[in-house]
Curated annotation (Swiss-Prot):
GO terms for biological process: translation. Belongs to the universal ribosomal protein uS17 family. One of the primary rRNA binding proteins, it binds specifically to the 5'-end of 16S ribosomal RNA. The keyword Transmembrane helix does not apply. Keywords: Ribonucleoprotein, Ribosomal protein, RNA-binding, rRNA-binding. This is Small ribosomal subunit protein uS17. PANTHER family: 40S RIBOSOMAL PROTEIN S11 FAMILY MEMBER, 40S RIBOSOMAL PROTEIN S11-RELATED. The lineage of its organism: Archaea, Methanobacteriati, Methanobacteriota, Thermococci, Thermococcales.
Protein backbone atom coordinates (compact mmCIF):
# COMPACT_ATOMS: atom_id res chain seq x y z
CA UNK A 1 0.00 0.00 0.00
CA UNK A 2 1.34 3.42 -0.98
CA UNK A 3 0.37 6.51 1.04
CA UNK A 4 -0.76 9.79 -0.49
CA UNK A 5 1.92 12.30 0.51
CA UNK A 6 0.06 15.36 -0.82
CA UNK A 7 2.20 15.98 -3.92
CA UNK A 8 1.02 15.24 -7.45
CA UNK A 9 3.86 12.87 -8.36
CA UNK A 10 4.02 9.17 -9.17
CA UNK A 11 4.96 6.86 -6.27
CA UNK A 12 8.05 4.66 -6.70
CA UNK A 13 7.61 1.25 -8.36
CA UNK A 14 9.65 -0.55 -5.69
CA UNK A 15 8.42 -1.19 -2.16
CA UNK A 16 10.52 -0.72 0.99
CA UNK A 17 10.12 -1.23 4.72
CA UNK A 18 11.94 1.94 5.80
CA UNK A 19 9.99 3.73 8.60
CA UNK A 20 11.47 7.07 7.41
CA UNK A 21 10.05 6.66 3.89
CA UNK A 22 7.21 9.11 3.08
CA UNK A 23 5.60 6.58 0.69
CA UNK A 24 5.81 3.33 2.70
CA UNK A 25 6.67 4.46 6.25
CA UNK A 26 5.23 6.85 8.82
CA UNK A 27 7.03 10.06 7.78
CA UNK A 28 4.87 13.10 7.04
CA UNK A 29 6.09 15.88 4.76
CA UNK A 30 5.25 19.56 5.11
CA UNK A 31 6.77 22.90 4.26
CA UNK A 32 9.18 23.60 1.44
CA UNK A 33 9.76 21.46 -1.67
CA UNK A 34 12.98 21.86 -3.70
CA UNK A 35 14.47 20.45 -6.87
CA UNK A 36 18.20 19.82 -7.19
CA UNK A 37 21.07 17.61 -8.35
CA UNK A 38 22.55 14.86 -6.15
CA UNK A 39 26.27 15.62 -5.63
CA UNK A 40 27.07 12.93 -3.04
CA UNK A 41 25.56 9.62 -1.95
CA UNK A 42 28.39 8.37 0.28
CA UNK A 43 26.62 8.25 3.69
CA UNK A 44 24.21 5.36 4.15
CA UNK A 45 20.60 6.30 3.23
CA UNK A 46 21.63 9.95 2.78
CA UNK A 47 22.26 12.18 -0.24
CA UNK A 48 23.60 15.70 -0.57
CA UNK A 49 21.47 17.75 -2.96
CA UNK A 50 22.76 20.97 -4.48
CA UNK A 51 20.22 23.54 -5.63
CA UNK A 52 20.96 26.75 -7.49
CA UNK A 53 18.92 29.92 -7.18
CA UNK A 54 19.13 33.61 -8.08
CA UNK A 55 19.66 36.26 -5.40
CA UNK A 56 18.97 39.94 -6.14
CA UNK A 57 21.72 42.48 -5.33
CA UNK A 58 20.03 45.82 -4.68
CA UNK A 59 23.22 47.88 -4.97
CA UNK A 60 24.03 46.65 -8.48
CA UNK A 61 20.42 46.02 -9.56
CA UNK A 62 21.39 42.58 -10.82
CA UNK A 63 21.02 38.93 -9.89
CA UNK A 64 23.76 36.53 -8.88
CA UNK A 65 23.64 32.76 -9.01
CA UNK A 66 23.98 31.12 -5.60
CA UNK A 67 23.93 27.51 -4.47
CA UNK A 68 23.04 25.65 -1.32
CA UNK A 69 23.70 22.07 -0.31
CA UNK A 70 21.02 20.19 1.60
CA UNK A 71 21.35 16.78 3.26
CA UNK A 72 18.30 14.57 2.63
CA UNK A 73 17.18 11.06 3.57
CA UNK A 74 17.31 8.64 0.61
CA UNK A 75 14.78 5.79 1.04
CA UNK A 76 15.70 2.40 -0.49
CA UNK A 77 12.65 2.45 -2.80
CA UNK A 78 13.89 5.67 -4.47
CA UNK A 79 17.66 5.01 -4.33
CA UNK A 80 18.94 8.28 -5.85
CA UNK A 81 22.51 8.27 -7.20
CA UNK A 82 25.08 10.98 -7.97
CA UNK A 83 23.98 13.11 -10.93
CA UNK A 84 20.23 12.44 -10.56
CA UNK A 85 17.79 15.36 -10.61
CA UNK A 86 15.56 14.85 -7.53
CA UNK A 87 12.63 16.41 -5.71
CA UNK A 88 13.10 16.82 -1.94
CA UNK A 89 10.50 17.82 0.65
CA UNK A 90 10.83 19.22 4.16
CA UNK A 91 9.97 17.01 7.12
CA UNK A 92 10.66 16.74 10.84
CA UNK A 93 14.34 16.59 11.89
CA UNK A 94 15.61 13.09 11.06
CA UNK A 95 19.10 13.70 12.48
CA UNK A 96 21.38 16.60 13.39
CA UNK A 97 21.66 17.79 9.77
CA UNK A 98 18.82 16.00 7.89
CA UNK A 99 15.47 17.81 7.67
CA UNK A 100 14.52 16.79 4.12
CA UNK A 101 13.61 13.53 2.36
CA UNK A 102 13.86 12.56 -1.33
CA UNK A 103 10.32 12.00 -2.64
CA UNK A 104 11.06 11.40 -6.35
CA UNK A 105 13.80 11.09 -8.95
CA UNK A 106 12.81 13.43 -11.78
CA UNK A 107 15.63 12.43 -14.12
CA UNK A 108 18.34 9.78 -13.82
CA UNK A 109 21.99 10.68 -14.49
CA UNK A 110 22.13 8.35 -17.53
CA UNK A 111 19.14 10.10 -19.14
CA UNK A 112 20.64 13.58 -18.68
CA UNK A 113 23.73 12.86 -20.80
Amino acid sequence: MVRDIGLRIQPPAEKCDDPKCPWHGHLKIHGRVFEGIVVSDKPRKTVTVERQYYHYLKKYERYELRRSRIHAHNPPCINAKVGDRVLIAETRPLSKTKHFVVVAVLERAEERR
